[in-house]
C-alpha cells in the first residue's frame, strides 16, 4: 500500500543514499551556501525561465506552505482547502498562526470540487456582510492528495476558473 501522509514517513531512494555516501566526507559550507545548493538554484532558475530569481531553500513543507500563504494573502484573506488538505489539519495551526484562516470544503477522495468552490465564492460575495468576513483569497491544492489521488488538468483548470 502507498501512503502519502508526508515525506518523513519513508526512507530515501537508493540513488539519493548513494549520492549521500559519495559526498558524505566533503567539507562544504552550510546553510545554503554550498555548491550543491548553488547548482540547484541555477537548475530551478532555468526551469522557471527566471535567471534573476532569488531562490531560497526551506527546511520542510509546513514552513514552505506557511511562508507562501502568508506572503501571497492580504491580512483579511484566507486559504480554501479540502477538509483533508495538508494545510487544514496536518500542519498543526501553522497557517492560522500567520493570521490566515483555512476555509475548508468537503473532500472527494482528497480533491476539491470546482462546483463547491464556485458556490463558496458566490455565497461569500452574495452576503451583504462579506466585508466583515474572511475573504477566500487563495486555493490550496495537494497533488497528490492525502489519499494519493491526482487532479486532472481539466479539474485544475475548472478550479482555477471557479475561484476568479
Across the structure, where does each feature detected by a protein language model lie?
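N-terminal amphipathic/basic leader segments beginning at the initiator methionine
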Residues: 1-19
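Conserved N-terminal alpha-helix of the aminotransferase class I/II PLP-enzyme fold
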Residues: 13-61, 83-88, 94
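Solvent-exposed alpha-helices and their adjacent loops that cap or buttress functional pockets
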Residues: 47-50, 72, 94-97, 129-134
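Conserved core of the PLP fold type I
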Residues: 52-73, 103-110
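Conserved PLP-anchoring active-site segment centered on the Schiff-base-forming lysine
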Residues: 71-89, 118
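PLP-dependent aminotransferase-class I/II
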Residues: 99-146, 150-155
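Conserved small/polar residues in nucleotide/adenosyl-binding loops
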Residues: 162-164
Amino acid at each position: 500500500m502507498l501512503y502519502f501522509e508526508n515525506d518523513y514517513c519513508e526512507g530515501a531512494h537508493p540513488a539519493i543514499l548513494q549520492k549521500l555516501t559519495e559526498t558524505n566526507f566533503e567539507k562544504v559550507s552550510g546553510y545554503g551556501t554550498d555548491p550543491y545548493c548553488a547548482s540547484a538554484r541555477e537548475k530551478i532558475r532555468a526551469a522557471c525561465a527566471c535567471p534573476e530569481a532569488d531562490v531560497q531553500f526551506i527546511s520542510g513543507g509546513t514552513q514552505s506552505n506557511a511562508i507562501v500563504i502568508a506572503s501571497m494573502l492580504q491580512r483579511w484573506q484566507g486559504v480554501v482547502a479540502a477538509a483533508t488538505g495538508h494545510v487544514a489539519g496536518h500542519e498543526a495551526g501553522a497557517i492560522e498562526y500567520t493570521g490566515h484562516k483555512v476555509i475548508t470544503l468537503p473532500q472527494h477522495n482528497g480533491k476539491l470540487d470546482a462546483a463547491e468552490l464556485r458556490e463558496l465564492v458566490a455565497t461569500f460575495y452574495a452576503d451583504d456582510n462579506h466585508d466583515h468576513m474572511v475573504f477566500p483569497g487563495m486555493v490550496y491544492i495537494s497533488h497528490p492528495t492525502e489519499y494519493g489521488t491526482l487532479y486532472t488538468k481539466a479539474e485544475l483548470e475548472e478550479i482555477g476558473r471557479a475561484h476568479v
